[in-house]
UniProtKB/Swiss-Prot annotation:
Record text on subunit structure and interactions: Part of the 50S ribosomal subunit; part of the 5S rRNA/L5/L18/L25 subcomplex. Contacts the 5S and 23S rRNAs.
InterPro entries, sorted: Ribosomal_uL18_bac-type, Ribosomal_uL18_bac/euk
Name of the protein in its database record: Large ribosomal subunit protein uL18
Lineage: Bacteria, Pseudomonadati, Pseudomonadota, Alphaproteobacteria, Rickettsiales
PANTHER family, sorted: 39S RIBOSOMAL PROTEIN L18, MITOCHONDRIAL, LARGE RIBOSOMAL SUBUNIT PROTEIN UL18M
Amino acid sequence: MEPAMSLCDLKRATRRKRRVRLKLRSLSSVRLSVFKSNRHFYAQLIDDEKGATLAAASTLEPDVLATAKRRVNSEAARVVARLFAGRLDGLDANYRKFVLDRGSCRYIGVVAAFADELRSLGFEF
């Protein structure tokens, strides 16, 4: 069993999330929000003007569950990125450009693998 986050770590993560969201507020109305837990990875495209989620994908999808056995890894994040790109292509509006809202997650490992895969599929952020 992994130890819970300390109070100092939680405060640091909260500050990081606020700092990132404050910078993103002025950039675009459409943002790609990602969240990583120890077992799963989630991504959703959010339109802040409408207050609606346009598309979402995660490792909880049946297609991805086989790749992510017990913990989230870079390969599972790449599969989620391909699934997410397919869902974005299915939308009637052309969402090829948005900003990445990494929240309290640092841009390394799984988040970087997800972003690199989306960039290789032709998305800009």
